């Protein structure tokens, strides 16, 4: 055989591959079979209902927490799940808002104003319901030790001042620290300017980056059952059931009030706006947002979950990419309930009589204070002393109340976050569907409309 370039001749050689050994062929076949089984299981896992997987994780975590409370390594998936959500949420919000403003036709139309109205009105109504329940089912507390906490805001002015000053934090520091008021402020500024000044390449980059982050969030949420298992295990193994024995009535009052807000007040608001049966929307939001928020105990960590749910509800991305992180900051029904009930329980314990006018004033203060809980370390609990100051409660007593709050926080904070976070989606969807009705677009099928959604 001649080489075409050199013209030199080489003897013909018969090229033959070495036959694989039987055991090698068998091993490779087994590996491929295992890989195929793994892929099939992964696909089957992803196709199954996320809610059923989460419920299974809850049950498994509770059982393991009761049976083997010393196996602390079982809580690691929960820690990793919450950390992953908290890590990606700030940059997700920042990029999505910029991308929506720079690439879309986003205008801060009446939908945004209406969402803010819904957030504030529902928070005020939650505080009023808390007043009513506190009068109907009065509860006292056994005060023991004062809580060791950082500086408490001296008044509503300081809370609002901290909230506004926080807007002008360095944007990099805001993303690193999860300061969503500042993140939203800078994202809106950058997005508006980018729409006017940036080239097509820059806009495309942010659009692609938002898609990458959204896909990442989808993957994290897909692993939620393992995270919920770890979080449930940690709660049961650490606290057990003794908390219900010592503070059962207070927990029942808080839980009952929050359930009343979630299952009566919020549905009533949705019904008055849409004139449709609100419960299909309410239950979807509680099931797909509230359950996850209950275990993460962080509205910020639940932002990616809520954005994914808004996408499945067919909402405008330009709308929910702003309203959801805004809701995580100012939509605080649960916080208003906690501040109001804990304050009225304190006054009852001390024998201080509260008239109706004072209770309404407390509701207004609780509403304004609740909107500032995202800017206070410790959230709603550290705003209790400020509310108690309305009635002249001594500082050492209020710190004992805060201490009780921290003891029951495993239940209180979980339900508070679930109520707050599910409400973000409920009221965003309500404002969007109201806009659909006004513009002649049919509502989703679960609200007796004709628009079919993949949900």
Predicted regions mapped to residue ranges:
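Short, Lys/Arg-rich, polar N-terminal cytosolic tail immediately upstream
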Residues: 31-46
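Juxtamembrane helix-boundary/capping and inter-helix hinge elements in multi-pass membrane proteins
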Residues: 101-110, 196-200, 239, 275-278, ...
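Membrane-interface alpha-helices at helix entry/exit sites of multi-pass transporters
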Residues: 109-115, 219-222, 312-328, 357, ...
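Helix-loop-helix junctions within the multi-pass membrane cores of secondary transporters/permeases
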Residues: 288-370, 442, 446, 450
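Transmembrane alpha-helical segments and their short flanking loops
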Residues: 341-455
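Signature of multi-pass transmembrane helix bundles
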Residues: 42-67, 79-88, 110-280, 441-446, ...
């Amino acid at each position: 055989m001649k080489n075409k370039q050199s013209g030199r001749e080489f003897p013909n050689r018969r090229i033959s591959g070495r036959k694989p050994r039987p055991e090698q062929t068998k091993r490779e076949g087994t590996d491929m079979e295992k890989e195929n089984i793994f892929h099939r299981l992964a696909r089957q896992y992803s196709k199954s209902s996320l809610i059923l997987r989460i419920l299974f994780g809850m049950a498994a975590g509770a059982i393991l927490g009761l049976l083997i409370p010393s196996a602390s390594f079982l809580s690691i998936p929960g820690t990793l799940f919450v950390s992953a959500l908290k890590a990606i949420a700030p940059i997700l919000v920042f990029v999505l808002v910029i991308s929506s403003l720079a690439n879309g036709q986003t205008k801060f139309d009446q939908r945004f104003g209406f969402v803010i109205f819904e957030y504030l009105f529902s928070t005020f109504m939650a505080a009023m319901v808390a007043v009513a329940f506190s009068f109907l089912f009065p509860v006292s507390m056994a005060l023991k030790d004062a809580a060791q906490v950082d500086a408490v805001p001296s008044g509503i002015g300081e809370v609002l001042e901290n909230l506004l000053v926080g807007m002008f934090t360095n944007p990099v520091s805001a993303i690193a620290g999860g300061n969503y008021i500042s993140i939203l402020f800078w994202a809106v500024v950058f997005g508006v300017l980018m729409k006017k000044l940036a080239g097509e390449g820059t806009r495309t980059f942010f659009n692609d980056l938002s898609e990458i982050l959204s896909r990442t969030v989808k993957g994290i949420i897909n692993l939620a059952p393992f995270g919920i298992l770890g979080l449930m295990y940690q709660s049961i193994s650490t606290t057990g059931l003794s908390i219900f024995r010592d503070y059962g009535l207070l927990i029942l009052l808080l839980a009952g009030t929050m359930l009343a807000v979630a299952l009566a007040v919020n549905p009533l608001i949705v019904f008055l706006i849409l004139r449709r049966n609100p419960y299909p929307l309410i239950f979807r939001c509680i099931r797909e947002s509230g359950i996850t928020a209950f275990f993460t105990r962080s509205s910020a960590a639940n932002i990616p979950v809520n954005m994914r749910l808004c996408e499945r509800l067919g909402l405008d991305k330009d709308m929910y990419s702003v309203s959801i992180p805004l809701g995580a900051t100012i939509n605080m029904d649960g916080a208003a309930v906690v501040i109001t009930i804990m304050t009225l329980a304190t006054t009852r314990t001390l024998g201080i009589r509260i008239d109706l006018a004072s209770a309404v004033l407390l509701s207004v203060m609780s509403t304004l204070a609740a909107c500032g809980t995202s800017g206070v370390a410790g959230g709603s609990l550290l705003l209790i002393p400020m509310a108690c100051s309305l009635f002249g409660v001594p500082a050492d007593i209020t710190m004992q109340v805060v201490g009780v709050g921290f003891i029951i926080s495993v239940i209180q904070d979980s339900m508070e976050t679930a109520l707050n976070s599910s409400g973000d989606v409920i009221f965003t969807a309500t404002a969007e569907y109201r806009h659909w009705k006004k513009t002649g677009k049919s509502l989703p099928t679960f609200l007796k409309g004709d628009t079919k959604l993949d949900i």
